[in-house]
């Protein structure tokens, strides 16, 4: 009996790597207030790293392009990525800047607030991307975020577009983007806040989500997915519009759920599924 060939997705993730320092508390403090927290732990983090790890755990062949400082946080992160079977050949080291860190507070409902000190992430350059051209050329999908310089995102997008590669952009943190970048992006994955930044429309319900998706699509992107947390995701795939509800689970901590969604979506699309099928898969993975 002939065993069918299953394509192993090749994904290049270009983005940030941080060390997350997480404190759990019953509630989040208000400005000027000091409260006592509970447990404290450190994890590998940064949107790029989280998405790379998610894609690797779902079976993809992942290359991660990023930059760390020459310090303990950076070296520890590098070892973690290697243990996840991520190709770290193009994680560069900046001898002058520290590795990125994120300070995260999580309340009893699983909601969080985050402050990021980007460090070496902000020195990831177009010249660094050039060194990984061959990997980009070989990839099925290029997955990016906005925790690295916008100039680098624009350069990598143009290069991937030139090579005919699928580009998925998670436009976080929220920022205004030029239409040339958006036209070369195959799928964009904003949350409510990022969708409002891109569309000028506040997303409060299904109707406003539909209007925001239309406004973003008018900038030249056929495929738009607005992630709506526990409600699910509103999807535009070419001329189809659909609300896909999230899987119902007990929420412990929402930190990183959006990054798992992005990583899972990139894997599913690279395996040949439609966008709607991929969003359903990503919803389940991020639950």
PLM feature spans:
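Glycine-rich phosphate/adenosyl-contacting loop at the front of the ribokinase-like
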Residues: 1-67, 72-86, 251-252
């Amino acid at each position: 009996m002939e065993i069918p060939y299953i394509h192993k997705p090749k994904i290049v993730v270009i983005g940030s790597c941080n060390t997350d320092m997480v404190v759990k508390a019953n509630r989040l403090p208000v400005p000027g207030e000091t409260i006592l927290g509970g447990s404290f732990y450190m994890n590998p983090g940064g949107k790029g790293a989280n998405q790379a790890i998610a894609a690797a755990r779902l079976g993809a062949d992942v290359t991660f392009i990023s930059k760390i400082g020459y310090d303990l946080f950076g070296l520890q992160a590098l070892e973690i990525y290697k243990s996840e079977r991520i190709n770290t050949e193009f994680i560069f080291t900046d001898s002058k800047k520290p590795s990125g860190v994120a300070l995260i507070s999580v309340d009893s409902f699983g909601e969080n607030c985050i402050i990021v000190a980007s460090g070496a992430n902000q020195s990831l350059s177009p010249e660094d991307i050039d060194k990984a051209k061959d990997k980009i050329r070989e990839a099925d999908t290029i997955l990016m975020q906005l925790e690295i310089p916008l100039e680098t995102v624009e350069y990598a997008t143009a290069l991937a577009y030139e090579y005919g590669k699928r580009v998925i952009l998670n436009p976080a943190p929220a920022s205004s983007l030029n239409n040339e970048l958006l036209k070369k992006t195959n799928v964009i994955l904003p949350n409510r806040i990022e969708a409002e930044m891109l569309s000028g429309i506040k997303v409060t319900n299904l109707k406003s989500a539909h209007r925001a998706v239309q406004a973003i699509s008018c900038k030249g992107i056929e495929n738009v997915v607005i992630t709506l947390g526990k409600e699910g995701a509103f999807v535009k795939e070419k001329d189809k519009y659909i609300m896909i509800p999230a899987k119902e689970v007990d929420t412990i901590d929402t930190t990183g759920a959006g990054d798992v969604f992005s990583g899972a979506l990139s894997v599913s699309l690279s395996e040949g599924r439609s966008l709607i099928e991929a969003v359903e898969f990503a919803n389940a993975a991020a639950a």
